[in-house]
Amino acid sequence: MRNWRWLLLVLAALLAWLQHRFWFGPGNSGEVRMLQVQIVQQHQENERLRQRNASLAAEVKNLKDGDAAIEERARSELGMIKPGEIFYRVVEDIPAPLPNDTSADHGVDLSQPRREKR
């Protein structure tokens, strides 16, 4: 009977040591959870970069194969035009405020009749 008590005591001590190592030792459960979160974040970043690489590869292929993409970039980014073309720039006017627009009257209440000073 006495041997069983010693065996139980040794097993309890072993269990306590294993639990301590599981919760507080190197590679503990908190660290494992943190690493799992980092893995998920890294997978998301990798997927984002794969999509970006595919987009850039398609753009490079388009620039190598097609003149339309080169022309579009030259027109939009560099402001280039073809020989013989006439460049027109359309500048839109700022719309005048409407009479009932209270945002432009600078605090003047238009709903009240105006009283003139004499």
From Swiss-Prot:
<feature type="topological domain" description="Cytoplasmic">
    <location>
        <begin position="1"/>
        <end position="6"/>
    </location>
</feature>
<feature type="transmembrane region" description="Helical">
    <location>
        <begin position="7"/>
        <end position="24"/>
    </location>
</feature>
<dbReference type="GO" id="GO:0005886">
    <property type="term" value="C:plasma membrane"/>
</dbReference>
<keyword id="KW-0812">Transmembrane</keyword>
<dbReference type="GO" id="GO:0043093">
    <property type="term" value="P:FtsZ-dependent cytokinesis"/>
</dbReference>
<dbReference type="InterPro" id="IPR023081">
    <property type="entry name" value="Cell_div_FtsB"/>
</dbReference>
<dbReference type="GO" id="GO:0032153">
    <property type="term" value="C:cell division site"/>
</dbReference>
<feature type="topological domain" description="Periplasmic">
    <location>
        <begin position="25"/>
        <end position="118"/>
    </location>
</feature>
<keyword id="KW-0997">Cell inner membrane</keyword>
<feature type="region of interest" description="Disordered">
    <location>
        <begin position="98"/>
        <end position="118"/>
    </location>
</feature>
<keyword id="KW-0132">Cell division</keyword>
<comment type="subunit">
    <text>Part of a complex composed of FtsB, FtsL and FtsQ.</text>
</comment>
<dbReference type="Pfam" id="PF04977">
    <property type="entry name" value="DivIC"/>
</dbReference>
<keyword id="KW-1003">Cell membrane</keyword>
<protein>
    <recommendedName>
        <fullName>Cell division protein FtsB</fullName>
    </recommendedName>
</protein>
<keyword id="KW-1133">Transmembrane helix</keyword>
<comment type="similarity">
    <text>Belongs to the FtsB family.</text>
</comment>
<feature type="compositionally biased region" description="Basic and acidic residues">
    <location>
        <begin position="103"/>
        <end position="118"/>
    </location>
</feature>
<dbReference type="GO" id="GO:0030428">
    <property type="term" value="C:cell septum"/>
</dbReference>
<comment type="function">
    <text>Essential cell division protein. May link together the upstream cell division proteins, which are predominantly cytoplasmic, with the downstream cell division proteins, which are predominantly periplasmic.</text>
</comment>
<keyword id="KW-0131">Cell cycle</keyword>
<feature type="coiled-coil region">
    <location>
        <begin position="30"/>
        <end position="66"/>
    </location>
</feature>
<dbReference type="InterPro" id="IPR007060">
    <property type="entry name" value="FtsL/DivIC"/>
</dbReference>
<keyword id="KW-0472">Membrane</keyword>
<keyword id="KW-0175">Coiled coil</keyword>
